[in-house]
Amino acid sequence: MSFIDPYQHIIVEHQYSHKFTVVVLRATKVTKGAFGDMLDTPDPYVELFIATTPDSRKRTRHFNNDINPVWNEAFEFILDPNQGNVLEITLMDANYVMDETLGTATFPVSSMKVGEKKEVPFIFNQVTEMILEMSLEVCSSPDLRFSMALCDQEKAFRQQRKENIKENMRKLLGPKKSEGLYSTRDVPVVAILGSGGGFRAMVGFSGVMKALYESGILDCATYIAGLSGSTWYMSTLYSHPDFPEKGPQEINEELMKNVSHNPLLLLTPQKVKRYVESLWKKKSSGQPVTFTDIFGMLIGETLIHNRMHTTLSSLKEKVSSAQCPLPLFTCLHVKPDVSELMFADWVEFSPYEIGMAKYGTFMAPDLFGSKFFMGTVVKKYEENPLHFLMGVWGSAFSILFNRVLGVSGSHNKGSTMEEELENITAKHIVSNDSSDSDDESQEPKGTEGEDAEREYQNDHQASWVHRMLMALVSDSALFNTREGRAGKVHNFMLGLNLNTSYPLSPLRDFTQESFDDDELDAAVADPDEFERIYEPLDVKSKKIHVVDSGLTFNLPYPLILRPQRGVDLIISFDFSARPSDTSPPFKELLLAEKWAKMNKLPFPKIDPYVFDREGLKECYVFKPKNPDVEKDCPIIIHFVLANINFRKYKSPGVPRETKEEKEIADFDIFDDPESPFSTFNFQYPNQAFKRLHDLMYFNTLNNIDVIKDAMVESIEYRRQNPSRCSVSLSNVEARRFFNKEFLSKPTA
């Protein structure tokens, strides 16, 4: 049965661009002048340039010793019709050292009408005639998807997954507790969340996933969302060729072997050379390269070394029959001069799409990193490998990479790594790239000596390999500066008009008065937190910086709280660092709650004083106080990293008896002076791995009944509230006009 999607009828307005096609047909009587022709026959080629478009410079191949060349080469430019677009045509002569300009002409694109196609002659030096064929059309099918709705692939997945979950949930809960599951409408949407926290989060999440898999809970989940360290485990799991036929148990054993080695062992000359060759290829193609690329390669070599060519879009096969929960990953877009706690756009990644819900703009995964203009790809690159994205998703660790490898000097001797990470802001890690270079040469160069050019590049590459190797194995500036460490990609929203975009979703009334709640004034971590989250992205910047989402708050709730996903039950696992094992565990959850309220998204009230009343527990349940009023508010089961019952029981209900059994479970997580579970520990001996893995495996299994009870409650709520995507046109208009008014305000 198909359902009406109200978000599909909300128009995310955008301006259409023009596609200007130029076919360089031929030229006759190409000349270098009377004297020049006596010395040499021209080797002509044509260069086309439009300054107002990103992929601005294009050129034909050159012909040796040909005064009547026939090229028949077509080139496309994506143009903003509101700009004064002028085509500059340059006839060039290819030489070994420096190419020579034979003549230049211009053509105003505004003289063309949409739908028109014509041949235009150009005369150079009163003798040479060149014929170009030009056409102009509207780009009616952009490469970005502009919509508030989920993509069709995710909708189809959800429908098929509901069918699977209905049977799985009946099996899990038994006939009595699942008697309310009459149809897929009654199936609650369950999401599993994993926090950041480096390898601690990854190892802990591996134990969680094993428990969820073996207990049948995973078969009842629609989504699994990760941030930073948790995304590394999700990437390892979903990229494994034997998953889901082979469960997490076997895959976790492979993971334990992979993380038992020192990451410095990956920095062999042969591997560094291979890394650098790959980065050189990426850089020479016109894509930005940062330290995050290197970090992603190291993470990839550690965790998925035998599948380094895996891409995000290739993970679609893991959900092709809705056999697994849909994996969702995240990073932040940040601005160079603003703290990420004040401003950050959440970017979501799935095997189907990558995009920002705040602006209603999404793209296929293989287009992320390509060069866009006004929603259309102007230069497509190969899809980034999964390990590059793993580096972006966990890029906080590339910032303090010297601490990760233990090669730092005397800097910050009095601070812990956690304290350093706590103090990092976007201003520390993002270079203000004022030049915003397109990496395109604006000067002609020699083209006949292609062998010489290749030799030059090889020499240059070899020297770069040497420098990079020296930098990687020595205490160099590469390690001692944080600036420029953030991931960088081409801005896929370049040239768009954001004046009519929607900040996140038109779920409820979104007027200025709705922001004056006293509860939003209370700071959780910083007085300025989320102060500028309504600001738009800079659509004039050619590149954007993408960083670890944990730098704003360490739980990926924004992915799951999108009302289009209609999540009923959220099971979150928080592996965030705390000052001690007995410290309150709600900081990240409180930040998520505040973010949700500022975006008018339903979220249960988080009472931090439950810690004072009930003490430290393995998990806490937060429900809407009044479900009839707090419509669409999910239930949250929040697991924290705590060693409580695991000390006494080797499995739920089975006490530890021998001295060895008790000793293996007698450990602290944050109070251990040797810090085996530090956020910056990237080597886990087998015992440390097993302790953390088994702890979270136990904690999850020990609370399976809590999860089942919440599922039963969610089924009943679904039956009483079958529609979870109610949107009125008045709400849509209120949000639109609020955004226009906000964006028109002058900044202080």
Swiss-Prot record:
Residues 6-122 form the C2 domain. GO terms for molecular function: calcium ion binding; calcium-dependent phospholipase A2 activity; calcium-dependent phospholipid binding; calcium-independent phospholipase A2 activity; ceramide 1-phosphate binding; lysophospholipase activity; O-acyltransferase activity; phosphatidylinositol-3-phosphate binding. CDD domains: C2_cPLA2, cPLA2_Grp-IVA. It is found in: Cytoplasm; Golgi apparatus membrane; Nucleus envelope. The modification Phosphothreonine is found at T268. Its EC number is 3.1.1.4, 3.1.1.5. The modification Phosphoserine is found at S2, S434, S435, S437, S505, S514, S726, S728. Ca(2+) 2 binds at D40, D43, D93, A94, N95. The active site is at S228 (nucleophile), D548 (proton acceptor). It catalyses: a 1,2-diacyl-sn-glycero-3-phosphocholine + H2O = a 1-acyl-sn-glycero-3-phosphocholine + a fatty acid + H(+); a 1-O-alkyl-2-acyl-sn-glycero-3-phosphocholine + H2O = a 1-O-alkyl-sn-glycero-3-phosphocholine + a fatty acid + H(+); a 1-acyl-sn-glycero-3-phosphocholine + H2O = sn-glycerol 3-phosphocholine + a fatty acid + H(+); 1-hexadecanoyl-2-(5Z,8Z,11Z,14Z-eicosatetraenoyl)-sn-glycero-3-phosphocholine + H2O = 1-hexadecanoyl-sn-glycero-3-phosphocholine + (5Z,8Z,11Z,14Z)-eicosatetraenoate + H(+). GO terms for biological process: arachidonate metabolic process; glycerol metabolic process; leukotriene biosynthetic process; monoacylglycerol biosynthetic process; phosphatidylcholine catabolic process; phosphatidylglycerol catabolic process; prostaglandin biosynthetic process. There is a cross-link at K540, K605 (Glycyl lysine isopeptide (Lys-Gly) (interchain with G-Cter in SUMO2)). Residues 138-739 form the PLA2c domain. Residues 428-458 are annotated as: Disordered. Its main location: cytoplasm. Ca(2+) 1 binds at D40, T41, D43, N65. Phosphorylated at both Ser-505 and Ser-726 in response to mitogenic stimuli. GO terms for cellular component: cytoplasm; cytosol; endoplasmic reticulum; Golgi membrane; nuclear envelope. Residues 1-178 are annotated as: Phospholipid binding. It holds the Pfam family C2. Activated by cytosolic calcium, which is necessary for binding to membrane lipids. Activated by phosphorylation in response to mitogenic stimuli. Residues 442-458 have a biased composition (Basic and acidic residues). Has primarily calcium-dependent phospholipase and lysophospholipase activities, with a major role in membrane lipid remodeling and biosynthesis of lipid mediators of the inflammatory response. Plays an important role in embryo implantation and parturition through its ability to trigger prostanoid production. Preferentially hydrolyzes the ester bond of the fatty acyl group attached at sn-2 position of phospholipids (phospholipase A2 activity). Interacts with KAT5. This is Cytosolic phospholipase A2.
